[in-house]
Structure formats: C-alpha cells, structure tokens
C-alpha cells in the first residue's frame, strides 16, 4: 500500500518491525494480532478506530508513542492497526 509518493511502508513491514514484539504475544496486556474481540473492546471504549489511533500516537500504558515507530505517519499507523485488529 504505497502512497502516491511511493515512500510508504507496508502495514506488514511496520507490524514486523515495530508492533509484533508486544502485540504478537500480548505482552503487558497488549491486544494480540488477530484477536478482533480484544481490539473491538478497546475500540468501543476509546471511540472506535480513530480513538485507538489517537492512543497509538500518544502512547498508552506500557506502549511508547507510536509504538516505537517515531517516523510512521498517521496513515501508516492506521493501516497497521487495521491489519492487526481486523477492524
């Protein structure tokens, strides 16, 4: 899913490099990749996908801002969240 500029990373690349360490195993309460019910519960409490994205950008609990992907765009983070969550 490259942007018009061709520089965007794929959601899979971002997940593998920045998200999988915690979301792959559910470390420290992180919702696991593919556990749509866990992600939906969070979405319901945080204002949907936009709410989850906002928390991902600012950081939440043990998760640092942008989940260690400081140079990820909001769109890249949204795509990674959608891919991990199934939402």
Swiss-Prot record:
Pfam families from the UniProt entry: Cytochrome_CBB3
Residues the entry annotates as binding heme: 19, 22-23, 63
Post-translational modification as stated in the protein's UniProt record: Binds 1 heme group per subunit.
Keywords from the named record: Disulfide bond, Electron transport, Heme, Iron, Metal-binding, Transport
Example of a GO MF term: iron ion binding
Subunit description: Homodimer.
Protein name as catalogued: Cytochrome c5
Organism: Ectopseudomonas mendocina (Pseudomonas mendocina)
Lineage per the UniProt record: Bacteria, Pseudomonadati, Pseudomonadota, Gammaproteobacteria, Pseudomonadales
């Amino acid at each position: 899913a490259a942007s018009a500029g061709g520089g965007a990373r794929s959601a899979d690349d971002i997940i593998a490099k920045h998200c999988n360490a915690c979301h792959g195993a559910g470390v420290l309460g992180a919702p696991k990749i593919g556990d749509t019910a866990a992600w939906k519960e969070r979405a319901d409490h945080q204002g949907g996908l936009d709410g989850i994205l906002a928390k991902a950008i600012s950081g939440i609990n043990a998760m640092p801002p942008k989940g260690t992907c400081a140079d990820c765009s909001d769109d890249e983070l949204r795509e990674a969240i959608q891919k991990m969550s199934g939402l």
